[in-house]
UniProtKB/Swiss-Prot annotation:
Source species, domain of life: Eukaryota
Organism listed in the record: Mus musculus
Region (Disordered): 38-62
Name of this chain's protein: Putative uncharacterized protein TRPC5OS homolog
Length: 110
């Protein structure tokens, strides 16, 4: 088994993180493209439901009667999680500029 230097390992880790960020961006783009057709399908389904005669079923409870309406309608902190790729790339560049030279200096001095 070959011995690999710490800077090489850190560089490999940074490359992996950068690749994960690109994958996350692609997934977010794919998800956002998939939401548009589903919204259109929902609109068509709602139109079809409005045109259909009402079915014999129990009506939904009145929202005004719910005691905890504010907690249902409030936005939770984790609802707006968005991957900030620009900030992550800046952090990765700082690692390249600051940490890798220091690691290289430490390994060369030993």
């Amino acid at each position: 088994m070959e011995s690999v230097s710490i800077p090489v390992l850190v560089a490999g880790l940074i490359d992996c993180v950068a690749q994960l960020i690109r994958i996350a961006e692609d997934l977010l783009q794919f998800i956002s493209q998939e939401q548009v057709p589903s919204v259109q399908q929902n609109a068509r389904a709602e139109e079809a439901e409005a045109a259909a005669p009402p079915a014999e079923e129990d009506s939904l409870p009145d929202l005004a009667d719910l005691s905890d309406l504010e907690s249902i309608l409030s936005v939770r902190e984790d609802d707006d999680l968005i991957l900030d790729t620009d900030e992550t790339m800046i952090d990765i560049n700082e690692i390249y500029k600051d940490i890798l030279p220091a690691i290289k200096d430490d390994t060369e001095s030993e």
